[in-house]
A protein has these predicted regions:
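Aromatic (phenylalanine/tyrosine) cluster motif
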Residues: 6, 37-39
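C-terminal accessory/tail domains of diverse enzymes
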Residues: 43-421, 427-444, 450-489, 500-879
Length: 879
């Protein structure tokens, strides 16, 4: 600093000399002395606005950590048994303009990054876990289901998959083909008790593709068909290049029987040749199961997976020995006998044959014409070579023990062969004895499904690791819009509360806890808006209960009364009643039970085991850019759960009416309301501080600019605006519904107002300032059309930009000063790309606000127009 090099960065040079020695505070010679010389220099910022890059000082974070431990103590005392999970989302830091990071859900690049991330997280959280490459959700309009990469591991610490070198790399070609697939499946069949003779080779449907080829124009070839559908074009080219007579993979009909596994035949029409259903999915999803011998509905051998809410699940076995299935004379299979498969044979041990199966249970018995065949095995394990790698498609099973037994057999075989494989297909059954961590794609983001945490320390450790490992994978937690606005990833950071087992769920044990949370969130709109994303409103991903239907609050009060009646009458509430009472209320306008601020579709839905998990998902949380900001959100919820566990919240529901989209859209009122939340937590004994959430407010309601004129101060901040889904329109080969994001809102706050002399106008219209409780201070919202798309509400209304604000002196009929806010670049420049970093984004924001631009001369403004529906907002579309 003595050279003055940092003066341009805002530092104040204390001494500037050509020679640094001449600026030294001490010079000259010294004699020996015992005096010790020391110096200290500190730099303190006079003022620092809250920022997301470093949201908390170390002193603040120590207080947050201490409070987290204190809440843990209360949760332990109350025997709450609370666990918390989450679903953080991430975007690419290298390709912000890519379609997969803005619109689409799946891409090759996203798949590679997802694979790298799941392996990193597996190494941190779950060494020895099973890495499963499965199929995820399938949404209308998407050609294939989305991928779902997951790691499963046992809570008792016993590894499921021991050798990581046997997990194939998706980016590597090992040169494996159909011959390797057949050998692997043959060895596996012999090991677990099946018969290699029951392997069925699978082929692409030659008749279908021959018919398809006959429909091509005469001037194209299958390799270059010029079809409009890119995926169809690539599929046909790939199949004809590999040949219609090439084996796609092998299938082994397999099911659990007794203490082992048995295989059988499918008695297909074409000499046991398996013609796959045309498509791009793994062969396990394309098996022609309708070609397997017919079975009457009353005789169908349904698989009944274990219930995760069963409190009597035993401990999982530490090891999985295999029984060798002994086969007597041809056509007379037996039940699994004693022994340990291939290992037993190598030791010279012979399994003893048991009694032959009766014909109505024999999987090798061919059914007569018209005869129902319930004995036919209808599940299969498939091995498919794909891009030089072997993919094993797991069959559905009933219990976790069966699944782990089969996985242990697979690892034994691939260890002997030295062949790395990829496990796909069916996932392990839902089981509280297993933990799961998953990475899945969503439109514009990659989502991580965290495993639940029991304590604050676990939650802190796991959240920080996930953020850091994502950063190492070149995935970030923030985006910048074209105009430079700083936003989250665009995805959620949903919080899931429950327990290790469904029967321990605090929501099922104390349904009044759900009532308390619902009522408190409805009473305090700041909890809905402060942590949410840009897309809010009645048709958003997480609408409030009072946004969707007008009668929701009345019906919710009836449900609360019924809940109280059951508790008072019987002393408890059965778990299914909680689902029945609230399932049809916690929905969006279309009736979707998942798209709700409080989603209970995994609480205790009776129709499936996966719906009876005792979980409540809170979906109105956007991804914050810093891990500690996310943890602060979790801490608020943990504090409220601890508070309501001891003191249920039974206040009346508030009929906000249009206020919910008027007053509560403004940051001033959200801040006031959230201060009340902090006050309630303090009264409960939890010393939260409002300053801990200043970064959240600054991130959610960024400051646009300010103006100071004659002791009057004006501040502009971004406010909230609900986006509405419009009506159906034809487009894209089907029916589409657009989202209208063309309307925006900002807040204007004025300080130093004296009486009625001064008014504030926007584009010549008086702004309806409302008192805030502080003398001389007023606040209002301005709603305006930012841009004019062809499809929106009121499409004939043009953009109101730029917004010119005047500080109007009613005595002199003049503007004494003003400022101007541009929605886009003031010079008319249209940005083609997103900002590359925060500096460019800041430059774009600063370029759109000017502290000048008032209206000159004497002006006459119209009287204030009162809007009874939205009294706090000046809607420029209506004036």
């Amino acid at each position: 600093p003595t050279s003055g090099l940092f003066a341009g960065e805002g530092h104040i040079p204390l001494a500037c000399t050509p020679d640094s020695a001449s600026a030294a505070p001490i010079s000259g010679g010294v004699d020996e002395c015992e005096t010790e010389f020391s110096f200290e220099m500190t730099v303190t910022r006079i003022y620092e606005s809250p920022r997301v890059t470093k949201p908390y000082s170390e002193e603040q974070w120590e207080k947050i950590e201490s409070l987290g431990h204190a809440i843990d103590v209360d949760l332990e005392k109350g025997d709450v048994r609370l666990t918390m999970g989450g679903e953080p989302t991430f975007v690419s830091t290298d390709d912000p303009d890519g379609a997969e990071w803005n619109f689409t859900a799946v891409s090759h690049k996203k798949r590679i990054l997802s694979g790298e991330l799941i392996k990193r997280l597996r190494g941190k959280f779950a060494p020895g876990s099973l890495l499963h490459y499965g199929q995820g959700k399938w949404y209308p309009g998407e050609p294939l289901p989305r991928y779902a990469l997951a790691a499963y591991w046992r809570k008792d610490g016993v590894p499921i998959w021991k050798d990581d070198s046997l997990i194939a790399d998706e980016s590597k070609n090992y040169g494996h083909g159909a011959k390797d697939a057949k050998e692997l499946l043959s060895r596996l069949a012999s090991l677990v008790g099946g018969d290699p003779k029951h392997l069925i080779p699978a082929y692409e449907d030659a008749f279908y593709y021959t018919w398809k080829e006959r429909r091509f124009p005469t001037n194209v070839t299958p390799e270059k068909s010029n079809l409009k559908d890119k995926q169809e074009r690539e599929r046909i080219a790939r199949i004809f290049q590999q040949g219609l007579n090439a084996v796609v993979g092998y299938s082994l009909p397999l099911k659990r029987a007794g203490g082992g596994w048995i295989s059988g035949s499918w008695f297909l029409r074409d000499d046991d040749t398996l013609w796959l259903i045309p498509g791009d999915s793994p062969m396990g999803l394309r098996l022609p199961l309708d070609s397997v011998p017919w079975v009457a509905e009353k005789d169908f051998p349904w698989l009944r997976q274990q219930d995760p809410s069963n409190p009597k699940l035993p401990e999982l076995p530490k090891e999985f020995p295999y029984r060798q299935r002994f086969v007597g004379r041809a056509g007379s299979p037996t039940l699994p006998g004693e022994g340990r498969g291939q290992r037993a044979q190598k030791l010279g041990e012979k399994p003893k044959p048991l009694e032959p199966l009766p014909p109505d249970e024999n999987p090798l018995h061919r059914p007569a014409p018209g005869q129902s065949a319930p004995w036919i095995i209808r599940t299969a394990l498939c091995v498919e070579p794909r891009n030089g790698r072997l993919h094993l498609f797991m069959p559905p099973v009933e219990t976790t023990e069966d699944y782990l037994d089969l996985i242990a057999g697979i690892e034994t075989v691939v260890t002997e062969m030295g062949t790395p494989v990829i496990i796909e297909g069916e996932t392990p059954p839902r089981d509280p004895r297993l933990n799961k961590l998953a990475v899945t794609p969503d439109p514009g983001v990659i989502e991580v499904n965290m495993h639940p945490s029991k304590t604050w320390d676990e939650l802190v450790e796991r959240t920080e690791i996930i953020y850091e490992e994502a950063r190492q994978t070149r995935l970030g937690t923030e985006k910048f819009m074209l105009d430079g606005r700083h936003t989250g990833t665009g995805g959620g950071n949903h919080i899931i509360i429950g327990a290790e087992t469904p029967q321990d769920s605090p929501i099922l044990r104390r349904p009044d806890l759900l009532r308390s949370l619902l009522t408190y969130w409805q009473n305090h709109p700041s909890l809905s808006w402060l942590f949410s994303g840009l897309f809010i409103g009645p048709t958003s991903q997480a609408p409030r209960i009072d946004e969707a239907r007008n009668d929701s609050l009345y019906e919710l009060e009836v449900a609360f009364k019924e809940l109280d009646r059951n508790i008072n009458t019987f002393g408890y509430t059965p778990p299914w009643l909680c689902d029945r009472l609230f399932r049809n209320l916690l929905i969006d306008a279309s009736g979707n039970t998942h798209r709700s601020e409080f989603s209970i579709d995994k609480l205790y839905a009776p129709e499936s085991a996966s719906g009876r998990l005792g979980l409540v998902e809170m979906r109105a949380f956007e991804m914050p850019p810093h891990a500690r900001m996310s943890l602060a959100q979790h801490l608020v919820l943990r504090g409220l759960v601890a508070k309501f566990w001891n003191e249920p919240y039974k206040n009346d529901l508030v009929r906000w009416g249009t206020d919910i989209h008027d007053r509560w859209m403004l940051p001033h009122f959200c801040e006031t309301d959230f201060r009340d939340v902090i006050g309630d937590l303090k009264k409960a004994g939890y010393p939260f501080e409002f300053d801990w959430f200043a970064p959240h407010f600054e991130f959610r309601f960024p400051r646009i600019g300010d103006l100071e004129q004659r002791d009057l101060q004006i501040e502009l901040r971004t406010a909230l605006e609900p986006w509405h889904v419009l009506g159906e329109e034809p487009g894209g080969g089907g029916t589409v519904r657009y989202v209208d994001s063309s309307v925006e809102r900002l807040q204007i706050k004025a300080r130093g107002l004296a009486g009625d002399r001064f008014a504030i106008t926007c584009n010549g219209h008086r702004v309806p300032l409302h008192p805030t409780g502080t003398n001389g201070e007023g606040v209002a919202g301005v709603r305006y059309r930012a841009w004019q798309p062809p499809i929106c509400l009121q499409p004939t209304i043009k953009s109101h930009a730029p917004l010119r604000f005047d500080l109007y002196d009613t005595w002199n009929k003049r503007s004494i000063g003003g400022c101007t806010y541009h929605v886009a670049h003031p010079g008319g420049r249209g940005y083609d790309t997103f900002p590359v970093n925060s500096y460019e984004a800041e430059a774009r924001r600063l370029a759109r606000f000017f502290r000048h631009g008032h209206t000159p001369g004497q002006i006459k403004i119209p009287p204030l127009e009162k809007n009874s529906d939205f009294p706090f907002t000046l809607d420029l579309r209506k004036v």
